[in-house]
Amino acid sequence: MAVTADVKGTAILRNKVADYLNTEPGGESPAYHLMNVFETIDENPNAQVVEKHYTSDKAATKLTSGYAPQFPITGDQYLDNDVSEFIRDIAEEQQSGVETDFIRVRLYQPIASKENTFYARKFRVSVEVSSITGAGGEIISQEGNLNQIGDVVIGEFNTQTKTFTEAAAAPASAEPSGT
């Protein structure tokens, strides 16, 4: 057996993950725009855990039963930026129940033989705007969350045509075989 040295691998910088938001959720076709005026777009999987203490064990067992993902966002407000204006209008007009699609693209994971196409995940999200702030001389800032609704969809995204294509087959789950 060959022995390999442990290596760190290649660091993934934040600009290698692109985020797109559909700014016309009621339109005939999605209008995905790059979220390019946002300083942070974090991903909090928020694993939901069930704890059981079985009679035959001294220690409790914790099982991950699901997720409640949330994407905290902080960005600047710009004129003529579709994402910024979409979020501004939700807050200023006090729109409730706004749902849209959010796509997270791994620019470091291209799809073989498909130009400008990368591994991506699509999330249905509700848009929660918690604040629009700005002191004198500052760019107005928008903060809030994109709260996931339902399950993530795995697929690929073409950054030139801005189209998402769902993967042909869902990845196999880690279910026990029962044998």
Task: For each feature predicted by the language model, list its residue ranges.
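Solvent-exposed edge beta-strands and adjacent loop segments
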Residues: A2-T74, Y78, V127-I140
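Extracellular/virion structural assembly segments
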Residues: K58-K122, F157
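Glycine-rich loops and low-complexity Gly/Arg-rich segments
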Residues: S96-D101, Q148-I154, A169-S173
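Short secondary-structure transition/capping segments
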Residues: A11-Y20, Q148-T163
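Short beta-strand and beta-hairpin "edge-sheet" elements
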Residues: V105-V152
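Intrinsically disordered, low-complexity terminal/linker regions enriched in Pro/Ser/Gly
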Residues: E156-T179
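Short, low-complexity, polar/charged sequence segments that are solvent-exposed and flexible
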Residues: I90-S96, K122-S126, L146-Q148, F164-A168
